[in-house]
Amino acid sequence: TTQKRESAFDFWCRLAFEEGINFWFEEEQLFYSDEHMGMTAGIHLTYNPQADTDISDSTVMTWQYGEYLCVDETIHKDNNFVRPSYPLSHENKIEQGGQHSVFESYGRFQLDDEGRPLTQVRFEQLRNGSKVGQATTNCFALMPGKIFTLSQHPHQPMNDRWQVISVSHHGVQPLADNSGGEGTQLSNSVSFIPGTQEWRPPYRYKPTADGDEVATVVGPPGEEIYVNEYGAVKVHFHWDRRGSADHSASCWVRVAMGWSGNGYGFSAVPRIGTQVLVSYLNGDIDRPIITGCTYDGRNAPPIKFPENKTQTTFRSQTHKGEGFNELRFEDAGGKQEVFLHAQKDMNTRVLHDRTTHVLHDHVEVIENNQQMQVKGARTETIDKDNSETVGQHKKITVGKTLSINVGEVIELRCGASVLRMDNGGHVTINGQEFKFEATGPVQITGKDVDIN
């Protein structure tokens, strides 16, 4: 619970009145009560409109009492982000009520156990004025927190127990030389309600937030990221003079993302030391939510400004280590670029087709090994030249057929040995030594066969 723009007394009163607790003083003692049964009874007053004929100190001279049209139903509704579909709503009403209801859509509770008593107290607060009266007496024992009994009123229902709500005392003591024989006069004005009715101090709405403010994300010593299962973080407000700038500085504060859904969306957790902008739901100072981050003297942007003002970047930082991952866009005229940096591994998963179309050059450098597996067929088309250089060994394994179709000439060369074939049907083998071995017959067929 946050105290804002209110004195310590007003802050205490707001919390007490929210629970329906009233208080009063008797001599040097402070009394609290949340029901009329905790109040002191035993004061007996007599109704006598002829005050001049009564010399006692327990007389009621004037009496007014009325019952008024008032709120007969209260409905309070709220929302718990942990159970967003749960109908977190409570109501209270008198018998046959519902014609004059008060509905508050922001009930200031997150659980049913909080909502039920809060709604009951608010209902009783709104009905404080349903049965109320005023009287003039000369009894100075009356004070808030007291219950008195009236007798000898001509209207019998008035001869009952009544609860004092407020008292204003008046006294006149003439100067001795000018008294004319008049004595000291004492009286008071009393506001009261039926003795069995629960009177609740008026509800005090908490001060609303003035707007957004800046805070710093904090956490336990030695941590860089401190977050709960909902992506919420702890923050230290700059106006906090007493709290430590660690994981005890605040409640868990949720972070608003640019896009969110059930298992999808954008997620980026503000890290410890990040300066964030904090907003408040419905202006409630006890319901902060982080709506953005900002750079400051401790946290510099990932790119240098204004030199790189045309760049848009998304850069992370290695947790408890060096390096980063980055996706960057350069929009300078003639230098447009999309840059992707992976600090370690990069995994791409495409569940259907993938198409890449490069309108100019494509350069790829792999400084270690490459492995490719094609479970179906593979087709490669090169409109012009194809040059392949293998520094050491190359091995081709074909399960069935290997077909090589060349339009003009094919030549295999290994040192001084050459095998050349052209599209005219000429096959030439050059070498220093020829060795033919066969485990079966060898057959040479031709129009002319010359062997030298």
Q: Can you name each region flagged by the protein language model?
A:
Residues 126-133, 150, 197-202, 218, ...:
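Glycine- and acidic
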Residues 195-212:
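Short boundary/loop segments of OB/S1/cold-shock single-stranded nucleic-acid-binding domains
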Residues 1-195:
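Extended, domain-scale alpha-helical bundle/helix-rich regions
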Residues 25, 31-33, 210-430, 434-437:
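Structural signature for extended repeat/solenoid scaffolds and their inter-repeat hinge/linker regions
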Residues 428, 432, 439, 445-447, ...:
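Long, distal/terminal scaffolding or interaction modules
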Residues 1-5, 62-69, 128, 135-138, ...:
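Hydrophobic alpha-helical scaffolding
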